[in-house]
A protein has these predicted regions:
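Short, Lys/Arg-rich flexible segments
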Residues: 1-193
């Protein structure tokens, strides 16, 4: 679970909540939680529409890992919790080192469009061999096509990924949306009593 925002309640939202009975507060927080869930999911859809940085075919990372794993988890009379159950999104948020999985020594980073989203061991590119450079201290998976080398993947023991400040929507925008929704809900609740 990602812990990106701890408390999005503005002083105005807190003042609105104080006016309500516990059951009404819980109902209000449930609606604000759903609003927050919608806003975060919309942010992930927007990020997905940007495509990927290398220009390779889309993997729909932001939809698959972000939007599909975001949900309102818990609501009480005092809190509403929206969670994003994705280690990949957590890694985007915090950054860090990516290493190969168990039993693997290297990550294979695609260098060509036809290699993107394909595992080298899948066998979809025939004639692959490892080419090493002692001078550069790196290795590649390549093919020999008509006497010319064609590089498909760069092999590396790890990759350092910087934290992405755009992983989650801007906090000020979320607070403004939640405050507006709280005002709307307060008017609706007051109109019912």
């Amino acid at each position: 679970m990602i812990s990106g925002y701890q408390d999005l309640a503005t002083p105005r939202i807190k003042a609105i909540l104080e006016q309500l009975a516990p059951a009404q507060r819980k109902m209000m927080l449930a609606r604000l939680g759903k609003e927050l869930e919608r806003e975060i999911k919309a942010h992930f859809v927007k990020r997905d529409d940007e495509g990927n940085q290398s220009g390779f075919p889309r993997t729909h990372f932001w939809t698959r890992e972000g939007r599909n794993n975001t949900a309102l988890r818990d609501v009480t009379a005092d809190t509403a919790t929206v969670g994003i159950a994705s280690p990949q999104i957590a890694h985007k948020l915090t950054g860090g080192t990516i290493r190969p999985g168990p039993g693997r020594r290297f990550l294979a980073l695609p260098l060509r469009e036809e290699a993107a989203g394909v595992l080298p061991r899948a066998g979809t590119i025939p004639g692959l061999f490892v080419m090493r450079s002692k001078i550069l201290g790196t290795a590649w998976l390549a093919t020999n096509e008509g006497g010319a080398l064609r590089f498909y993947w760069r092999l590396t023991p790890s990759v350092d990924q910087a934290a992405d400040p755009r992983t989650l929507p801007p906090i000020d925008a979320l607070r403004a949306k939640l405050e507006a929704r709280a005002e709307t809900e307060l008017s609706r609740i007051v109109g019912q009593t």
